[in-house]
């Protein structure tokens, strides 16, 4: 099976055999077009028309993102493979089994996933969500003034068909885990990036969109002096607001937000920006607003994949040295930021204030998403992470981490 999803992808038809127009004729095919759509192919490389039509329509109408289209395509493709192996659907053409399938067959499929394939309830629910969207938004609903492809009853009129998945505790990267990850690399650039991702609560897809200008603007905020009640001297803020061009907007759109980053972390980033290598590589970009805040060893932009590889490499090293007890994914850094915000005593007057801060800085649309971090009661969590000690501030922890792990960047060191 193969799934392809594109949004606004340029296609050049200048050399295409479809453009066999006489010089005097009006061209029937444009020289270049931009394409948005999706296609799902089976193992024999045959197009699955129903699935592909649904995903293309949803992409073209900005109903789903590219990643969602790929996930849906795979899930629906897996379901189709299961159906084609059942006796009653073996004569069906490509994905036409979806036009005949009944509720009990879908329920048997989910039971097969749990019992034979031993998939988790969460994974089964993910397949269920894809099927429900396929039936509700396409098969049983006409689109573009066309009648619905399916005339049989909708099996999803009552909602999900799979059991509700159990709620698992969020597994986060602790401050000690972060320290060991940082110590597992001898590149100050990589150390700086790991601390920044944790402190800013970034998704891996958001890192390439953080610009040099955003860092500079955030640091200008620290030049502002603040007067606190009962304190006569003006002080600099320990945190600076940083603009993030966030992910998870509708249909691949950017979802801007402000996050709070410790001043110590931003100062560490600026020292990296002062390195000869970063200064040399940033010349290829026009202006600070177009210059990525982090560049790889070759001067290119980080990608989702390269960030995952960085975490995989540093986690493996730390695991082999018995410094950590689990692999740390990029998203675990983001979870660690949430817990750090919830336990820091200098943001908000109470726990609810800090929970709202988590929602805003992580870019959650709904507060109940942020509440996943409250499955462990706050007072118990404090005792678990700091038995018998008083809580440090997040800013203080980041300052201490920078001091303990920062490497000097020499002019001749190309890291």
Q: Where on the chain are the PLM-derived regions?
A:
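Conserved tyrosine-mediated DNA breakage-rejoining catalytic core shared by Y-recombinases
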Residues: 210-267
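C-terminal secondary-structure termini that scaffold catalytic or DNA-interacting sites
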Residues: 1-13, 388-415
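N-terminal core-binding DNA-recognition domain of tyrosine recombinases/integrases
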Residues: 51-68, 76-166, 180
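Active-site/catalytic core of tyrosine-dependent DNA strand-transfer enzymes
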Residues: 260-324
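DNA breakage-rejoining catalytic core of tyrosine-based enzymes
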Residues: 157-179, 237-239, 251-263, 285, ...
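Basic, Lys/Arg- and aromatic-enriched nucleic-acid-binding interface segment
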Residues: 176-204
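Catalytic-site neighborhood detector that most strongly recognizes the C-terminal catalytic loop/helix
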Residues: 362-393
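Short, basic (Lys/Arg/His-rich) helix/loop patches that form interaction surfaces
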Residues: 300, 308-356, 360, 364
